[in-house]
From Swiss-Prot:
Pfam families the UniProt entry points to: MraZ
Domain of life: Bacteria
Protein's name according to its UniProt entry: Transcriptional regulator MraZ
Compartment annotation: Cytoplasm, Nucleoid
Organism name: Pelotomaculum thermopropionicum (strain DSM 13744 / JCM 10971 / SI)
Family: Belongs to the MraZ family.
Domain SpoVT-AbrB: residue ranges: 5-47, 76-119
Alphabetical UniProt keywords: Cytoplasm, DNA-binding, Repeat, Transcription, Transcription regulation
Gene designation: mraZ
GO biological process: negative regulation of DNA-templated transcription initiation
Cellular component terms (Gene Ontology): cytoplasm; nucleoid
Main subcellular location: cytoplasm
Length: 145
């Protein structure tokens, strides 16, 4: 399980240090792709494969399903950390997530998210203001929270 928040700089070559605890959970190789809300998602290979199976079952005749799967998989790349614990984030993914100099790496249960620092601060501020309201809606889903 991934949890926590870490801030790190992105070097001029587009490399980002991934905290050791996250690297251990992600494994030697993992998948990085375009996430939702303007961030990147990183999945351990077994989690990615399970997600891939679920997405394969979406009806390809539905335009919205095709569009989501196309966008999600076209941005995906397999990553491996170097000896210093850094990954190279491809330019297209850096542009998508507006990653320039500072990044925030967060653990979100089964995945890791990579955010541009300013985007994360903005998102976190908005989410904090509606945290209780969201919690009330989630309780209605009977998840036992």
């Amino acid at each position: 399980m991934f949890m926590g928040e870490h801030q790190h700089s992105i070097d001029p070559k587009g490399r980002l240090f991934i905290p050791a605890r996250f690297r251990e959970g992600l494994g030697n190789r993992f998948v990085l792709t375009k996430g939702l809300d303007g961030c990147l998602f990183a999945y351990p290979l077994p989690e990615w494969e399970a997600l891939e199976q679920k997405l394969k079952s979406l009806p390809f005749t539905r335009g919205d399903a095709r569009a989501f799967v196309r966008f999600f998989f076209s941005g995906a790349v397999e990553c491996e950390a170097d000896k210093q614990g850094r990954i190279l984030i491809p330019l297209n993914l850096r542009e998508y997530a507006r990653l320039e100099k500072e990044a925030v790496i967060i653990g979100v249960s089964s995945r890791v998210e990579i955010w541009a620092k300013d985007q994360w601060e903005h998102y976190k501020g908005q989410a904090a203001s509606s945290y209780e309201e969201i919690a009330e809606k989630i309780v209605d889903l009977n998840l036992g929270i």
